[in-house]
Amino acid sequence: MTVFLSFAFFAAILTHIGCSNQRRSPENGGRRYNRIQHGQCAYTFILPEHDGNCRESATEQYNTNALQRDAPHVETDFSSQKLQHLEHVMENYTQWLQKLENYIVENMKSEMAQIQQNAVQNHTATMLEIGTSLLSQTAEQTRKLTDVETQVLNQTSRLEIQLLENSLSTYELEKQLLQQTNEILKIQEKNSLLEHKILEMEGKHKEELDTLKEEKENLQGLVTRQTFIIQELEKQLSRATSNNSVLQKQQLELMDTVHNLVSLCTKEVLLKGGKREEEKPFRDCADVYQAGFNKSGIYTIYFNNMPEPKKVFCNMDVNEGGWTVIQHREDGSLDFQRGWKEYKMGFGNPSGEYWLGNEFIFAITSQRQYMLRIELMDWEGNRAYSQYDRFHIGNQKQNYRLYLKGHTGTAGKQSSLILHGADFSTKDADNDNCMCKCALMLTGGWWFDACGPSNLNGMFYTAGQNHGKLNGIKWHYFKGPSYSLRSTTMMIRPLDF
């Protein structure tokens, strides 16, 4: 936009400024235009020419090299007035310029407002078109997104269902795997136990084989020696047969000697019978002790309804003495795997390992009331005992049934003997309460009941081989069910001792 303004006073001041600062050439006569660009607006000012009556400046009128006159120049007052006039004109022009500036600013504000309004209207229409286009595009995109979302939801639902099915299948598989793992662990534990038992059995079998080999070698040596002895005997027999007359003579001499011995024995029996009538017989070791014999050893005692006396070992040292020993184990020199008759009448030597005999035990305990004391020792040297306040057994018809009362001692808080009554069993007389025949399985003769927690007549095992032996000399509540003891002693004493 171009605005043409003409101001006389503005032209005059510009003419004066032009006269003061520059000279125009004669060929530039007429009007002069001054164009000012301000942003988008251009302003053109028409300026009139000056009249050419400008006075020469002081520098042109005076010679700078001339001497100063004594009196002031006549033009000085005129210049002062002219300067004041110019200052007054400048003030007026300044006011006009300020008004012009205000006018331009106000016009520019209204024009700028109009331009902005037009621009806003144009922009609004454009924005509406763009908004409408965007809305349509947004609606289309929204529809597409909705379709995609629906497809994603459907696919997600299918995946979730499949994932759930897979989770259930995985859970079932994990459960089955856990069960199989537990079964495998149980099988492994059983296999470990079986391997351990097999190793133990192999060790035992190896030891038994070594023992059998040693016994075989010993037997072979014994057979060799016996063969040699038999050969020597055969030689002697051949020599004796050849000398029949000498044998007949010796036979006659032996017959005479036998007759003499028979006569002497008859006299000795008659003499002993007379002494028995004179001396009071001992019923048990308590009578021996009370008769003044307080040293442990072998003594002869007599039983009611028994034709012959019996040699027994009397313990005079344990718990004030007077104990009649009915069983003793110490070194395994005697085999306790015997039949009913041998356990009935007894076997062994009272000075070592022996069993007194069930018939004699019944005869003693039928005389008066007795207590029972059992002394035990393990292979580590530990000693213990079990004592019963009442002890007796039945007769043979009752299978020598055991009767006990009142248990005390250090060999376990509970009794390893059956208190309520158990019949005696041997390998040839099964009187226990078990189908397994305890006497055959556990060896020895004992009051087994249903095999029970004790067997002091079992197999004797030496040190190092006494563990894990169910058929050994056992007392369950002292050393457990499979520990074979080193020594045992069963002894009885009258309750009123």
UniProtKB/Swiss-Prot annotation:
Residues 276-496 form the Fibrinogen C-terminal domain. The lineage of its organism: Eukaryota, Metazoa, Chordata, Craniata, Vertebrata. Residues 81-119, 153-261 form a coiled coil. One of its GO terms (cellular component) is plasma membrane. Binds and activates TIE2 receptor by inducing its tyrosine phosphorylation. Implicated in endothelial developmental processes later and distinct from that of VEGF. Appears to play a crucial role in mediating reciprocal interactions between the endothelium and surrounding matrix and mesenchyme. Mediates blood vessel maturation/stability. It may play an important role in the heart early development. It holds the Pfam family Fibrinogen_C. SMART domains: FBG (SM00186). Homooligomer. Interacts with TEK/TIE2. Interacts with SVEP1/polydom. Interacts with THBD; this interaction significantly inhibits the generation of activated PC and TAFIa/CPB2 by the thrombin/thrombomodulin complex. NCBIfam families: GGGWT_bact. Residues 1-19 form the signal peptide. The keyword Disulfide bond applies. It is found in: Secreted. One of its GO terms (biological process) is protein localization to cell surface. Glycans are attached at residues 92, 122, 154, 243, 294. CDD domains: FReD. This is Angiopoietin-1. It comes from the Eukaryota.
